[in-house]
Regions:
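Hydrophobic alpha-helical scaffolding
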Residues: 1-2, 110, 128, 151, ...
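Short, charged, surface-exposed loops that flank catalytic or proteolytic processing sites
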Residues: 57-66, 127-132, 153-156
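Charged C-terminal helix
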Residues: 143-176
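Glycine-rich phosphate/dinucleotide-binding loop and adjoining beta-alpha-beta core of small-molecule
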Residues: 1-102, 173-176
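Gly/Ser/Thr-rich beta-alpha loop segments that engage phosphate groups in nucleotides
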Residues: 3-5, 87, 105, 112-116, ...
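Short beta-alpha connecting loops at secondary-structure transitions
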Residues: 54-55, 101-107, 117-121, 145-154
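Short, small-residue alpha-helix embedded
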Residues: 53, 109-140
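Short, well-structured alpha-helical segments that form the helix of a local strand-helix-strand
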Residues: 66-75, 130-143, 158-166
Length: 176
């Protein structure tokens, strides 16, 4: 990962200077917890532990009131916040909080957040507004996870979602 070194901090500071839209995950979130920033054209994607560090709360406190936590993330950091977990939440100021009703416990494995970040970034590259890219990305990711877990949730790997994402995206195109 990016780590928490002085080099990592300098890299993040340079990235934050750009006006381009960003999707921020993993170690970059941990760096933000140390040096908070506020911007409108980004999506932060913490799991409850990362959200706790960003908000100065224990992960259990985040889980206790996920709606307040995701609102707090947007208030403190701006942009759009995706609070990952069972019933992932997507919050953008001025919009209702979106709740993802798809996905499964097998998705709580290493690399799943990386896949989600890639899906959201790909949607942004297709010029979707950030809030829409976050909601659609979370839903597509969850649907792909459910398809990948059709044979059982145990042993599900992040790479198992890749082929399923193609099917889910193409199915969306057929209904559009």
């Amino acid at each position: 990962g990016l780590g928490r070194s002085s080099w990592s901090r300098q890299l993040l500071a340079q990235v934050l200077e750009t006006s381009l839209p960003l999707v921020v995950d993993a170690d970059a979130l941990n760096l933000l917890a140390l040096e908070p920033a506020h911007r409108e054209n980004w999506i932060i994607t913490p799991h409850p532990g990362e959200a706790g560090r960003l908000l100065g709360l224990p992960a259990a406190g985040v889980q206790q009131d996920r709606l307040a936590a995701v609102r707090g993330l947007v208030e403190r950091f701006g942009g759009t916040a995706v609070l990952k977990g069972a019933g992932s939440l997507v919050c953008t100021a001025g919009r209702p909080i979106a709740v993802c009703t798809v996905g499964n416990p097998g998705m709580a494995t290493a690399g799943m957040g990386d896949v989600l970040t890639g899906v959201i970034a790909a949607l942004i590259a297709q010029r979707l507004p950030l809030a829409d890219a976050a909601v659609l990305g979370v839903c597509l990711h969850g649907q792909a996870g459910d398809r990948a877990a059709a044979g059982g949730e145990r042993g599900l790997l992040a790479r198992d979602l890749i082929d399923e994402l193609r099917h889910v995206v193409n199915a969306q195109g057929e209904t559009a």
